[in-house]
């Protein structure tokens, strides 16, 4: 019943914001039309709004889960039209906060102690409020300033209910919408469910921050705040407090004298290093989560501050290698290699013709190379390649989609900081250096040394395993020979059966012909009272039937 009321409310909000037009041609559209008389008249102000703005306002009204839905949609530019994607970006961190007293109760329950014993000071007025959690300022008893991230109350049940409802709606749209194969609603909902599950465990987010901090502890390019583990639990995360400037606040960056050119190049270098050196990248890197250190001493050598570690990405070694090779092939305009890599990586079925895939890659990439270098986007090229490859049954791991949208965000931040940023010039040497180091003899020896204990542990079992494998191969070959003989016998049986069926059909036909000729009394030779041709036909037919019967 609760789900029904929730569905009715969603339908009502959709009608009020005229979002039923997005479902034209579906079964849902007909149901929404029936409900129109029960919804207040649409105001002229709403009617005049763009569809993207109407969708954004509706998602805000429906609550935090639908805000998160919009946030994820805003990053899937391969699925969402540009006008809608641009509007949904504005959903980032614009959610009403919950009561500070409620936050205190959640903290005390999670940490098992009072707020007063955990903190010297705790501000009940939140610094920021997002769709899943909100952040409060606090001070530890040792004087350190921290921020405390607290999950929204009862958010798990609300997410579970809304996800179940979204799955039902997605299934309905997938079966009824004429463009469902392009929209892929079930895929979007599955991604939302995975993303939300990761963001609901703040202890996991703390672990992500801790790993990222370890990788970049000695860097001048990016700073990751320290996790205060003694004040962290599944529903509460306490981090060192940072002061900085949002990376999209260009006016304040200029007023602070920050070298934006140097900063934009650092952002690209950090991203490629995270992906190809560390294989652990920040996958929610929009401007709200990427700040710039406001320390006056860092004007000429600025650094980023990373925030919000709920979504991190990792690639398999195979995907990491093929992605790096793809980038290098794009740099060198080697379309044949791009096509081969898509097949070798298993992203495209092997039966697809390489020449056809090469032509598709050329049609995607060449228009980009006619632009000035400062206007070329690797994220767009990669997105278009993946989009075109869908025609050839492209299969991608979700982490690759995550990387593509993160690259889009990073390039957006970089271009905001420096509109003339040449991403290719910055990214190429970083990628080449990382690949040289990664596939160098020194790195191979390091990996061998790391695996040496494992190799030594399994070494005594190696002769036995080899012997077992050889025995299996011999037995398998014998078994294959038996199967082959059985198949040959079956083939001969089928051939014999086919001949008998043919003989039976021919014999029956000739006997029928003999009977017809006998009844017609044709002119010609007779043997007694029987026409010769009838006699011949009958004899041959009888022989054919006897042959079919005898072989059975």
UniProtKB/Swiss-Prot annotation:
Q: Which GO terms describe its molecular function?
A: ATP binding; protein kinase activity
Domain Protein kinase: residue ranges: 121-504
Provide GO CC annotations from the record: plasma membrane
Instruction: Spell out the catalytic residues.
Output: 284
The protein's location, in the record's own words, is: Cell inner membrane
The primary location reported for this protein is membrane
Pathway entry: Cofactor biosynthesis; ubiquinone biosynthesis [regulation]
> What InterPro entries does the database record attribute to this sequence?
ABC1_dom, Kinase-like_dom_sf, UbiB, UbiB_bact, UbiB_kinase
Q: Which UniProt keywords apply?
A: ATP-binding, Cell inner membrane, Cell membrane, Kinase, Membrane, Nucleotide-binding, Transferase, Transmembrane, Transmembrane helix, Ubiquinone biosynthesis
The protein's name in its UniProt record: Probable protein kinase UbiB
Organism of origin is Xylella fastidiosa (strain 9a5c)
């Amino acid at each position: 019943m609760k789900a029904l009321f929730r569905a009715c409310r969603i339908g009502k909000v959709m009608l009020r914001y005229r979002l039923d037009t997005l479902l034209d041609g579906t079964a849902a559209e007909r149901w929404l039309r029936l409900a129109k008389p029960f919804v207040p008249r649409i105001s002229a102000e709403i009617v005049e709004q763009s569809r993207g703005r109407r969708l954004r306002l509706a998602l805000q009204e429906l609550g935090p889960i639908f805000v998160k839905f919009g946030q994820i949609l805003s990053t899937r530019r391969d699925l969402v039209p540009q006008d809608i994607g641009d509007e949904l970006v504005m959903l980032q961190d614009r959610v009403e906060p919950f009561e500070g007293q409620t936050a205190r109760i959640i903290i005390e329950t999670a940490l098992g102690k009072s707020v007063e014993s955990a903190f010297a000071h705790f501000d009940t007025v939140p610094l920021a409020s997002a769709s899943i959690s909100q952040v409060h300022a606090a001070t530890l008893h040792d004087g350190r300033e921290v921020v405390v991230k607290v999950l929204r109350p009862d958010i798990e049940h609300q997410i579970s209910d809304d996800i179940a409802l979204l799955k039902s709606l997605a299934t309905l749209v997938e079966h009824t919408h004429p463009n469902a194969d392009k929209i892929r609603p079930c895929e979007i909902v599955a991604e939302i469910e995975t993303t939300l599950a990761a963001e609901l465990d703040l202890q996991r987010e703390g672990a992500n921050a801790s790993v990222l901090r370890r990788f970049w502890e000695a860097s001048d390019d990016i700073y990751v705040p320290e996790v205060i583990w003694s004040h962290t639990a599944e529903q509460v995360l306490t981090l060192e407090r940072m002061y900085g400037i949002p990376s999209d606040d260009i006016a304040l960056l200029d007023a602070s004298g920050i070298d934006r050119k140097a900063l934009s190049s650092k952002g690209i270098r950090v991203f490629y290093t995270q992906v190809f050196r560390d294989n652990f990248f920040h996958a929610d890197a929009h401007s709200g989560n990427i700040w710039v250190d406001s320390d006056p001493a860092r004007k000429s050598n600025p650094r980023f501050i990373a925030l919000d570690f709920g979504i991190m990405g990792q690639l398999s070694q195979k995907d990491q290698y093929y992605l790096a090779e793809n980038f290098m092939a794009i740099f060198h305009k080697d379309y044949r290699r791009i096509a081969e890599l898509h097949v070798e990586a298993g992203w495209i079925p092997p039966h697809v013709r390489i020449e056809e895939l090469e032509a598709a890659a050329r049609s995607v990439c060449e228009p980009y190379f006619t632009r000035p270098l400062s206007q070329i986007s690797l994220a767009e090229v990669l997105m278009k390649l993946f989009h075109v490859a869908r025609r050839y049954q492209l299969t991608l791991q979700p982490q690759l989609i995550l990387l593509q949208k993160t690259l889009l965000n990073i390039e957006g931040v970089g271009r905001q900081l420096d509109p003339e940023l040449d991403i290719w010039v910055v990214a190429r040497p970083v990628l080449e250096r990382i690949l040289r180091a990664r596939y160098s003899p020194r790195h191979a020896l390091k990996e061998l040394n790391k695996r040496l204990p494992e190799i030594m542990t399994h070494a005594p079992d190696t002769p036995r395993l080899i012997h077992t494998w050889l025995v299996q191969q011999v037995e398998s070959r014998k078994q294959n020979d038996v199967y082959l003989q059985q198949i040959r016998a079956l083939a001969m049986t089928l051939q014999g059966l086919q001949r008998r069926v043919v003989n039976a059909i021919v014999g029956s036909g000739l006997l029928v012909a003999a009977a017809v000729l006998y009844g017609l009394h044709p002119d010609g030779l007779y043997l007694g009272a029987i026409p010769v041709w009838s006699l011949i036909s009958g004899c041959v037919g009888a022989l054919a039937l006897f042959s079919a019967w005898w072989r059975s």
